[in-house]
UniProtKB/Swiss-Prot annotation:
One of its GO terms (biological process) is translation. Belongs to the universal ribosomal protein uL14 family. Pfam families: Ribosomal_L14. Disulfide bonds: none annotated. GO terms for cellular component: cytosolic large ribosomal subunit. This is Large ribosomal subunit protein uL14. Binds to 23S rRNA. Forms part of two intersubunit bridges in the 70S ribosome. Part of the 50S ribosomal subunit. Forms a cluster with proteins L3 and L19. In the 70S ribosome, L14 and L19 interact and together make contacts with the 16S rRNA in bridges B5 and B8. Keywords: Ribonucleoprotein, Ribosomal protein, RNA-binding, rRNA-binding.
Length: 122
């Protein structure tokens, strides 16, 4: 469950380390985002010579949440930390690698690229 001001890990090699949610997209007063939702983020910490710089604003898709996602069979998939993958304006990943597992809930038309780059799909 991601809301405004939430700090997330960057799960890709775009150059960002930490990003902060500044808006949950999809609806005028939408409060929370879960796995697979698109959010606006500001880069709070970045590595030197990365593709992104501190202070820049990007779209991102949430790939892991500590709250978890409930499956139709009743099971819940949770993670230790919240993480997101940075996207460009065409909603394609900025990085070329994804770090850590992602959930099967990303298997939409939009995020098959992230699924194929991820080392593990839960």
């Amino acid at each position: 469950m991601i809301q405004m001001q939430t700090v997330l890990d960057a799960a890709d090699n775009s150059g960002a380390r930490k990003v902060q949610c500044i808006k949950v997209l999809g609806g005028s007063h939408r409060r929370y985002a879960s796995v697979g939702d698109i959010i606006k983020v500001s880069v709070k910490d970045a590595i030197p010579r990365g593709k992104v710089k501190k202070g820049e604003v990007y779209n991102a898709v949430v790939v892991r949440t500590a709250k978890g996602v409930r499956r139709p069979d009743g099971s819940v998939v949770r993670f230790d930390r919240n993480a997101a993958v940075l996207l460009n304006n065409q909603l394609q990943p900025i990085g070329t690698r994804i770090f850590g597992p992602v959930t099967r809930e990303l298997r939409g038309e939009k995020f098959m690229k992230i699924i194929s780059l991820a080392p593990e799909v839960l």
